[in-house]
Amino acid sequence: MTVKRFIAAPVLGMLILKSLYLQAADTTEHEVRLLIDAIAASHCDFNRNGRQHTAEEAAAHLELKYARAGKRIDSADAFITRLGSSSSFTGKPYLMSCEGDTLPAGEWMIDALEQIRAHTQSLDQSTVSG
């Protein structure tokens, strides 16, 4: 009986940790996909290494970088910092030009991520209360 409890506790703990890890991975994947979709839908110009690209081209580029990075990206914040803010080859920051205003792509994505999280949180709260 004691042996069963001894085995059950670590197994249960591992299952809980795995569940939390999978939830975090699902959240990361979901948030990164929403960020990439937001870029594609933004109609902003994307400056990468001195060259202008459409929003759709920027989204495709970031999608490719994300696919190559794999599990090394453990949060949407890490996606922005490590992949979305600057060129991995030149180190030059990416820029987004939207309606005449230009700002670093990382800043644009942080703002977008805050909006995504606020919207997701309000949906979660309405699901719980409704």
Feature-to-residue mapping (PLM):
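Bacterial N-terminal signal peptides
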Residues: 9-18
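Compact alpha-helical subdomains of small soluble proteins
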Residues: 50-130
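Bacterial N-terminal signal peptides that target proteins for export
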Residues: 1-10
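N-terminal secretory signal peptides
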Residues: 24-68
